[in-house]
């Protein structure tokens, strides 16, 4: 069987990472409202709600030793601005959620390949990873 094209393989890796974070959040009592929510300004990987808090979670799945410190450097100012605009679009479509306290979290997932196969691990979860300016 032919290997997946690189883009499809990376997309699948990202989807698996999002699944791990989704499971983690559910175990923490969060209700997932959306996954891979898209708008003209970008995509929100996960949107979740618990009590009076709404979180927008950016998930980065990387192999060990990645150039961007496990995905953390990929969430720079331009990416943060896109996430904020996407969150504003999400809230405009879900006005009943606009009174909740909102925050932006970042989840870092590590993908490890070995002879036994591929495994994933949540390396770090950063609540309120950046401020809304």
UniProtKB/Swiss-Prot annotation:
SUPFAM superfamilies linked: Restriction endonuclease-like
One GO MF term: nucleic acid binding
Source species, domain of life: Bacteria
Matching Gene3D superfamilies: 3.40.1350.10
Disulfide bridge map: none
Pfam families: UPF0102
TM regions (residue ranges): none
NCBIfam families (alphabetical): PRK12497.1-3 (NF009150), YraN family protein (TIGR00252)
Family label: Belongs to the UPF0102 family.
Name under which the protein is recorded: UPF0102 protein CYB_2119
Species this chain originates from: Synechococcus sp. (strain JA-2-3B'a(2-13)) (Cyanobacteria bacterium Yellowstone B-Prime)
Taxonomy of the source species: Bacteria, Bacillati, Cyanobacteriota, Cyanophyceae, Synechococcales
């Amino acid at each position: 069987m032919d290997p997946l094209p690189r883009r499809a393989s990376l997309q699948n890796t990202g989807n698996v990472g999002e699944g791990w974070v989704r499971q983690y959040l559910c175990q923490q009592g969060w209700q997932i409202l959306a996954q891979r929510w898209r708008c003209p300004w970008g995509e929100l990987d996960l949107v979740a709600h618990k009590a009076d808090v709404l979180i927008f979670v950016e998930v980065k799945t990387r192999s060990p030793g990645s150039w961007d410190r496990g995905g953390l450097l990929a969430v720079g100012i331009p990416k943060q601005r896109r996430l904020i605009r996407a969150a504003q679009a999400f809230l405009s479509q879900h006005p009943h959620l606009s009174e909740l306290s909102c925050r932006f979290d970042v989840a870092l997932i590590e993908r490890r390949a070995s002879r036994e196969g591929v495994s994933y691990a949540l390396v770090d979860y950063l609540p309120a990873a950046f401020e809304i300016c």
